[in-house]
Amino acid sequence: MLLLASLAFAQEPKQTFKVPMRDGVRLATDVYGAEAGGKKPVLMLRTPYNKNNAGTTAKRYQAAGYVAVVQDARGAFESEGQYIHHNNDDQDGYDTIEWITKQPWSNGRIGTWGGSHPGAVQWLAAAERPPGLEVIAPTAASPSLYYTAYIGGALRLALIGGAGPAINKPPAGKKTPEDLLPFYRQHPLAELDRILGWDMPWYRAVATHPWLDGFWNRQHATERVKGLDLPAQHIVGYYDFLSKETVGSFMRMRKFSATARGRENQQLILGPWDHGTVGKTVVAGFDFGEAAKLDVVEENLRWFDRFLKTNVTPSKDFPQVRYFVIGLNQWRTASDWPPREAVETSLYLHSAGSANTRKGDGTMTAKRAGREEAADRFESDPANPVPVEPPGSVMPRSSMFRPVERAVLEDRQDVLVYTAAAQSVDLLVAGNPRAELWVSVDAKDADYALKLVDVWPSGSAYPVAEGVLRLTHRDGDVKPSAVEPGRTYRIEVDLGHTAFLLQRGHALRLEIAGSYFPAYDVNSHTGEGPFAKTDRKAVQSVYHAPRTASRIVLPVLKR
């Protein structure tokens, strides 16, 4: 009888409303569970990807005792207005929540859910502080469009270049080329739409604002969400291009929430996934085992029940951080991220000036240089950029790096390779590794693109972390820092978030290159960014002498 009642409840039809925004534009909104009667807590999703695609999840929430509200974003599918990426999502989110609180089926307590774009709009709405919003669950989401589009000053080219034609579709008689790579190599990159042959206002706007200026104000809520008193569940994968921002949101809320309640009621779940495989076991053909499986909806429901259900008494404690250890293929818990018990451990770069390729003399040891060592140099050629993955690999545009074997790329002369000795015992790394490098270039700008790699006894090499920094962004993203050709600079490259077991017999390796194409745009070396009409080769140097001791810093845990 209970099963039949549950099934009947889950089958109730949805209702569709045209919800008015403050400017009169009406947004198509599906409501699941309103006809069951009574006032209930409400879970809301706002999406540009078609509300009808979220019906299965909405029904799961409905079956769990919630009213589920799913809305097409402004200008998308059945909604009115013009779609401008994130430009109205703060106010539209506020207005929709306000509308929900006034409905007869709402008890005025609201949570939000969704990943990627629907996760980002949760932050934008939350930044407006709408009454009734009590909990959020953004999965693989950034509160800032700027930091979705750029990292370390480099444009996420495959992501943004691919999204441009999807948002501003080609006119009749034209179609988006199947292979955009040749177009990504033309200049100026800011005019990719002209190169393709039709206007793409969204792409051009993003590509012509490589600095965090006033253009981004409506789409950049990173600072505005500080001071919120709002429980949030953050779920993301290490290989996700939004990993850094998702984890950053958790860390900011833990530090800057307005109350102890807000600071304590944050949860981070970190798994071995990329943007399209959250909760799955296989990523780019690499099987992490059944333990990697995660039901995001189930995790969200447990979180929502804790804060929205009056008839649920949650357990006193919950793990604030659950993280999957790659190589161990097991979950661990922590009270914070990075884990407080992690100890920063340095590995210093060394060579006799020939660290080019994996067959070179680049090494890493726990000791810094005790005498002068020759610098390593490579020539970065925009006409022949280092690919982000080996030839033949087809990487989704929403990925920046994946667990794909890459040793063949380490045979290139324009890749510096530093390999530590094989481990005599297992080494557990968990947290936010970074590289501190002393560098120079004979040009007005350059990129330093890094990958941290697990080298197996067989010689296979799998990336576990990565980062990139454009030299003109070395002091931040608000205004450029000029680069004087030949001058030595100390830079810090954030290598993101990871947890992996470097097993006995495996070795840790650092790659340093001048590009990872097409994940990131190729630096023209002219200092003109996306407006460069030409490019040039550049010689990039890495130093590791006593006074210029380049190193990586690893957060290491005792096993």
Regions found by a protein language model. Name each.
Residues 244-266:
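Active-site-adjacent alpha-helix of alpha/beta-hydrolase-fold enzymes
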